[in-house]
């Protein structure tokens, strides 16, 4: 039976599509534009025109599919238009689950985010964590609200996955860009924080397993390992056989810097690369427990060093990083 995928041209979406094809599945991918359709065709899937904002197009795209993988979403920090995050992540998700039901879909696998957990500072987030009661970023808010929509309207159909920071070959944006800059020595100023990571292949594999073994209406955090920024730098030094020099900013200086850069961006009309919500998120840090997904879905997480080595090797293959031995 054919499955439908939203967000198939994104980093996680492409990994999910690849794993579906390797499993011998027939894949139909939602495509907003001709360029996206070309990417999907090149991957070996059938592109179908549709848009998260167009409910009827989603019904048409999902009709005849038993399963929908809703991977599409907008992940953006320091947004100039926070309403765009709500439109895509909340309203778009509402359209997806409603269209899936109307089209007779039996299972929706929804790619949420570990950010939606909202764990309190200094704690390890798990599926049952109580939200702290305030948001660190517009992105977190949008994903938390989207989960509420899914659980209110399609808990009987939908398995929710909450990936931590997804890293691996194919990603050089967001946290992936920070890892690249740190490896290249172009991130000389850091803040002390911790973060959880899931390997991109583990993330994709978990999506397929969630279709079969996931319980509708339940969350599954995907988190393979957690490390501090100091531990990440040490691991990069070991793999690259080089010294990484960085200065750690105190909290007050980081917050002040975010405010200043954000203010300058408003004056110039440019998109800030750094802002207060980014600093808040970094200073809060994130640690997640991915045990439930591993145990109930049935897979083992990739070790941290393996994920980092594969990521650096991909950077090198793409000409983004010079390393002595990318193997």
Q: Which residues does each PLM region occupy?
A:
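N-terminal Rossmann NAD(P)H-binding glycine-rich loop of SDR-like oxidoreductase domains
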Residues: 3-23
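NAD(P)H-binding glycine-rich loop region in Rossmannoid oxidoreductase-like domains
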Residues: 35-91, 99
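Conserved catalytic-site region of short-chain dehydrogenase/reductase
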Residues: 77, 114-123, 166-172
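Conserved Rossmann-fold NAD(P)-dependent oxidoreductase catalytic core, especially the SDR/UDP-sugar
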Residues: 87-139
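Substrate-positioning beta->alpha
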Residues: 95, 145, 174, 191-211, ...
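Catalytic helix-loop patch of NAD(P)-dependent Rossmann-fold dehydrogenases
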Residues: 122-161, 165, 187
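NAD(P)-dependent short-chain dehydrogenase/reductase
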Residues: 157-197
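Mid/C-terminal beta-alpha module of Rossmann-like enzyme folds, strongest
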Residues: 206-273, 290, 303-327
């Amino acid at each position: 039976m054919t499955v439908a995928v939203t967000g198939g041209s994104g980093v996680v979406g492409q990994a999910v599509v690849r794993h579906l094809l390797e499993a011998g599945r027939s894949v139909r991918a939602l495509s907003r534009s001709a360029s996206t359709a070309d990417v999907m065709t090149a991957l070996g899937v059938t592109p179908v025109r549709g848009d998260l904002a167009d409910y009827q197009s989603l019904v048409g795209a999902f009709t005849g599919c038993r399963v929908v993988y809703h991977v599409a979403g907008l992940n953006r920090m320091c947004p100039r238009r926070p309403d765009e995050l709500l439109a895509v992540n909340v309203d778009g998700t509402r359209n997806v689950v409603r269209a899936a039901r109307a089209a007779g879909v039996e299972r929706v696998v929804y790619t949420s985010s570990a950010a939606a957990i909202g764990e309190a500072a200094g704690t390890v987030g798990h599926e049952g964590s109580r939200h702290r009661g305030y948001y660190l970023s517009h992105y977190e808010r949008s994903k938390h609200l989207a989960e509420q929509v899914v659980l209110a309207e399609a808990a009987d159909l939908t398995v929710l996955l909450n990936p931590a920071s997804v890293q691996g070959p194919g990603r050089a944006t967001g946290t992936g860009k920070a890892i690249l800059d740190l490896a290249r020595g172009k991130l000389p100023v850091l803040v002390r924080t911790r973060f959880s990571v899931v390997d991109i292949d583990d993330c994709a594999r978990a999506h397929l397993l969630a279709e079969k073994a996931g319980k509708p209406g339940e969350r599954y955090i995907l988190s393979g390992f957690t490390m501090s920024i100091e531990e990440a730098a040490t691991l990069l030094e070991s793999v690259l056989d080089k010294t990484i020099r960085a200065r750690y900013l105190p909290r007050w200086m980081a917050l002040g810097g975010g405010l200043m850069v954000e203010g300058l961006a408003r004056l110039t009309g440019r998109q800030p690369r750094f802002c207060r919500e980014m600093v808040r998120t970094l200073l809060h840090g994130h640690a997640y427990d991915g045990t439930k997904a591993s145990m109930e879905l049935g897979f083992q997480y990739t070790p941290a060093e393996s994920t980092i080595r594969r990521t650096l090797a991909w950077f090198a293959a793409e000409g983004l990083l010079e390393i002595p031995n990318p193997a």
